[in-house]
Structure formats: structure tokens, C-alpha cells
């Protein structure tokens, strides 16, 4: 499984119905799990984003498929980045 970090912003529609944020996040979790991914952690954050998610997918194709399905919800925008532990990065330097 490969790790991805997702930075999530609610859309104007998502902010308009902020009380439904738990429902939106459950839908996202359901989509991730249905496609074989694992939503490891979700954090509420301060700043330009509303949430940060740590997600594992079996491959990049699955990540793309999940992100396309999430985009269809039209209540949040995501920016997603592949991530690796620092030790792996440091080993790649030598």
C-alpha cells in the first residue's frame, strides 16, 4: 500500500451546510474503503484547508479513481500528494 496526504477544503456548498461535514467525511471514507483504500487518519486543521487526511491506496490508479469519485460529491476539493517516511527519502540520497 502507498501513502497519500490529502489536503481538503469544503466548497461553498459544503460550507453552507457545515453541519453535514460528518456525513461528507463518512461518504469519503466509504468511497476510499469500497475501492480498497484505508483512511488512516483525518484531522481538522486551521489555515487555508479544513481537513488533512492520511490515506493508503494499493496503487496510483486506485487513488485517481477515488479522487474522481470524491470530486463528484461537489462538497469538497482535495489536493493529494504521495508521501513516504523520511527514512526512505534519506536512503534514496545515498
Where are these regions (language model features)?
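A generic hydrophobic-segment detector
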Residues: 1, 38, 55-57
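Short S/T/G/P-rich N-terminal loop/turn motif that feeds into the first structured element of a domain
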Residues: 1-33, 90-94
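A generic structural signal for short beta-strands and their flanking turns/coil linkers
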Residues: 4, 35, 47-49, 74-76
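Short, well-ordered beta-strand segments in beta-rich or mixed alpha/beta enzyme
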Residues: 5-9, 43-62, 66
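Flexible, active-site-adjacent loop/turn segments at secondary-structure boundaries
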Residues: 8, 16, 44, 79, ...
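A short linear hydrophobic-aromatic micro-motif
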Residues: 36-43, 77-79
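A short acidic, often aromatic-flanked loop/helix-cap motif at beta-alpha or helix-coil junctions
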Residues: 48, 86-89
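An amphipathic, aromatic/His-enriched active-site/gating alpha helix that lines ligand/cofactor pockets
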Residues: 57-87
Amino acid at each position: 500500500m502507498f501513502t497519500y496526504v490529502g489536503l481538503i477544503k469544503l466548497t461553498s456548498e459544503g460550507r453552507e451546510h457545515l453541519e453535514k461535514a460528518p456525513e461528507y467525511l463518512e461518504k469519503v471514507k466509504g468511497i476510499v474503503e469500497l475501492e480498497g483504500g484505508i483512511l488512516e487518519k483525518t484531522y481538522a486543521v486551521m489555515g487555508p484547508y479544513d481537513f488533512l487526511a492520511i490515506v493508503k491506496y494499493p496503487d496510483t490508479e486506485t487513488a485517481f479513481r477515488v479522487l474522481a469519485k470524491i470530486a463528484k460529491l461537489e462538497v469538497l476539493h482535495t489536493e493529494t500528494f504521495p508521501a513516504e517516511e523520511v527514512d526512505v527519502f534519506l536512503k534514496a540520497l545515498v
